[in-house]
Amino acid sequence: PETLAIENQVNPDEIRRIVRDAQEKLFAARAQRVHPGTDYKLIMSWNGLMTRAFAEAACILDSDKYRQIAIANAQLVTSKMQATTPEGEHGWFRTYKDGRAHIDAFAEDYAAYANALISVYEATFDPEWLPIARSMIDSPISHFWDDKDAGFFSTSDYHETLVSRPKDFYDNAVPSANSEAAEALLRLYLLTANSEYETFALRIFQPFLPALGSAPTSFGRLLSAIDFYLSGPAEVALIGPFESDAMQDLVRATWQPYAPNKVVAGTEPKDNDATLDIPLLENRPMLHGKAAAYGCRD
């Protein structure tokens, strides 16, 4: 406004008044248009992408605000979107709106939210999230896996019968189910030492290796998962009282500056529940009564 006022030899407040009046007239004119329809439903896979982003941002930027957003979404999804399969097993719904969850989740929902919960665990070291993340991968292995040609079908074996079961490998605006699943499988393998997870991840890679060289832009997230595997990701275990300055310093040093391709686990010295399913934390004492960090690469 000041520059325009000088150029036109008027008071800056007059420029602001003109702009404000114009904005009000434009808004009034736009308000007369038919408003576009708005879809407020929650989609599990999209929320998985968002929750993971907030959880990782919380770690990298040391932001408790982002951490709380990730936790709140994880609590909402895991409490409101549970389902039961026809065999009576635990499953998930894809959408949630107005207090109602429905539509059986697709492979992309399971895979994206499994990755999200792994990241929420890394941001909080709360052991409750990893078993849920594991269940979100174990269920697709049982009900979505293609035993003949490898990879996850988009639909489960208890979805409605289709002419053919689709299988998505191409990464477009959002990652494919198989790309997300491959990364989740590799991360869980490092945290749990369950070699079956690594085996399934490598089987996902195998059929598409010939296509990666000719069309790499179609497999951006799959290539990221392959890079995660080939880089020999770091495994970091942090042991110490979570609220202590020493432990917080170790957490910050682990995440800053940003370096991808690692898994991070943490526990307090006497929290036996936190180590039950995480071999990375076993037999990791504090050193001389102080918080300690253990790191390794395969």
How would you describe each model-predicted region?
Residues 1-298:
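Glycan-recognition and catalytic cores of secretory/periplasmic carbohydrate-active enzymes
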